[in-house]
């Protein structure tokens, strides 16, 4: 039975019923299902879930032990609770008819290209073997990549991929060199990074629509953004050493902007603007040194 639903995640600690499946099917907000509290799903549980995934392919399943995917051929989005849940050499993945999204904590995934003909989204976390990092270049259909606290040494291995989304959490790779090659990138998010000092690669990402830099400790100044004509969202959150936001002046008025950090607040130039609501009231009160053209921006007329 479904024990609880938290946000977009459903947890179950006992056998699933037909009523559970009906509830899950009707809940359009569910995005992830996983066993909880040490419960080991039965074949009957997995067969019920397989019926659900046939109808709701956007829902992800978190595997908790090897062998579970054998009964889930319709599953398209899967992650593992701990390393090893997909069997030796990721062999359990062969049971899936179409693998679209995969979350790995496995340090060695050199076998992944064998199962990745349809893989569009990949999330990696933790330590990676050197050979595993190198095999990323073979995932030619990949569109979205998430690196959370990994040990990837360089972005060179993804330079030829047609990625549209990239998320980097942590300090590795310790240089952004190679990111300038990702010309198809539309969304970039970097968080909790204290190693990158040079963000000039941003000027080459001409198709970028969303830029989010959070807790980037060594970001001191922005590069010119005027060549990024597709930008619609810029967030510079808690970048405490960022001293100036002058490049934001060149952004169009249909671009949502949030920029804050210790030095910006001290200088009275922290900034928040939405095309729908205009400049935030807290900004008008606290950021007395904002450039006049930023402060004067108005919301779009409805």
Predicted features along the sequence, with ranges:
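Concave beta-strand-loop units of leucine-rich repeat
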Residues: 3-25, 29-71, 76-90, 98-111, ...
